[in-house]
């Protein structure tokens, strides 16, 4: 659902108000996340998770389209990198606070609510029966509604092609086939999609088995793996995402293909560093090599969006990003963890 719902939402975003679309999707995403905490069984949890996926799918394509209209071409690399950095900073918070919240008992949360003076609101709840993972879903989900309101009231919908040079404004695509026809004739776009999918394949595979590797080889528990390694790695990914966009922006006036070569060099450096991290016995070396590799690895993130927007007209930007996310989701998230798990079982 996350992969394929991006298509119709992106086409809608290329034709209508993107700020309102993002607002609705954030509300859906947040409310469905909170509802996961009150799911009564597998079916209801599955349905709420589908709602989360649909909400998530509707955010990135229109957000990228907005950024493309707000920033001129030579500034988009850093702007898109800053946007992408938010994903990594979210991962930092998830590693730092997700585990501790999920480990809370219902009575612990009740005591915290009373401590801040709002326990009376939930006086009818039997906190002895509430599991920590349910609390985590609700705490993470509900604040998103406030974020949606901030988006609605602080971001203005710019005209299409607002930051593009005169004469580049394209006609509005009347259906998905028109947008896809434009993409079909852009080989650069498809090479970028293929490259981004392969990088995501490796990245999702590594991230999925990060904690198990630290547990098996170094004896860490889940909390220590998340707080002492997962959070720093996510922070280094955020730094790499930002630096990649910043360097690309500075080099592009002197080196037209910097948007491709900067992430390529980052990935080349990351590969041997990952190998050193996986085989190091010293946890300090693991932290250094893995963190540095992660920083270099994620220098590509802003570049994929920059290329995706740069090769299409402003009327197809959201659609282009939706196609990119389909490929990245199916190849990266769909196959990467499975492949690493298969290799793990095969060699063990």
What are these regions (language model features)?
Residues 20-35, 258-275:
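Structural signature of the two symmetry-related core transmembrane helices
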Residues 4-43:
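Conserved MFS/SLC helix-loop-helix module at the cytosolic interface between two early adjacent transmembrane helices
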Residues 77-106, 144, 233-241, 325-337:
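Glycine-rich segments within core transmembrane alpha-helices of 12-TM secondary carriers
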Residues 158-193, 217:
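Juxtamembrane intracellular "pre-TM" segments in multi-pass secondary transporters
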Residues 48-87:
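Cytoplasmic helix-loop-helix junction between adjacent transmembrane helices
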Residues 102, 182-242, 296-305, 332-341:
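Extracytoplasmic gate region of multi-pass secondary transporters
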Residues 83, 87-153, 157:
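Helix-loop-helix hairpin linking two adjacent transmembrane segments in secondary transporters
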Residues 17, 38-44, 55, 72, ...:
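Helix-breaking motifs and short loop linkers at transmembrane-helix boundaries and internal kinks
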